[in-house]
Amino acid sequence: MTHAPCFCLLWALSCGGCGASTNLLGDGESGVPVASDGATKVADGSAGSPTSLGASGGRASSAVGGQLSPPVSPEQLDAATAVCGATSWIFSGLVPNSRSLGGVPLPSGSVTCGRIYRGSQLANLGADGCGDFAALGIKSVIDLRTAAEAALTPSPECTFKQAQYVSAPMPIPYNLSPANYIADLHTNASVLAAFAVLGEVASYPVLFHCTYGRDRSGVLAALILRLLGASREVVMAEYMRTQQSGFGSAPMSLQATLDEIERLGGAEAFLLSIGVPAKAIAVLRAQSVTPVVP
């Protein structure tokens, strides 16, 4: 498959350079209206009543139509994603920072369990991890690493036997700066390759990964979650779960990436502008969103 050339736009940025004001309550792209107090509006136009989920060392969060309102901590997101059971954190700790996006709250419901996974390099899977990989039924692996990285720590044979392997390199590894996160976002060939997989029904379940499962995987996860309608706070909390695996994180850099997505008109507008077909976006949403049951 031929993809558009790689355009690494190093957008001039200081920590405050994106500058856009942000609504942290249900401001994703699912089309679900949100009241001024953050409550999701129901069909008759009135605001729904929030239901407390409890707080983790802070004031209580609430869930409305599947959404969490501030503050949202990684621990609260762990609780919200427990609906996916043992599949939330995967590979028995053999592959650090590997987890399902299933159960992540959306204004219209939640991310469907068992459809999209994110992780770090798979070289240490071993027999137990290969068993877990098989049990998850993963059909597609999107590798965001460069060819040199993949050659240094190749994925085990069991992954190639079970799943299609798609190389979608984002060539700026190991760098937590805002400018490099944004450059990852603008690696159009990589984003196009990833969404070519995510846009096919037969691709699911899908696993995408980089080396640490943090930076490049974090950018792609943020783009997917914003496209599905997750609020910025939920996206940030999902990203910060990386710290639970012992890896550092760069919240300012992901915030800058989210600002850049908004500057470009939102996740859907950005993806359409670089050539991702509308049908692929529709497939991703259909495969990955479990609506609230009335």
Where are these regions (language model features)?
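Sec-dependent bacterial lipoprotein signal peptides
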Residues: 1-16
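Ser/Thr-rich, Pro/Gly/Ala-heavy low-complexity intrinsically disordered linkers and tails
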Residues: 15-79, 294
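Cys-dependent protein tyrosine phosphatase-like superfamily
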Residues: 19-24, 68-207, 219-294
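Ser/Thr-glycine-rich phosphate-binding loops at phosphate-binding pockets of nucleotides
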Residues: 212, 216-217
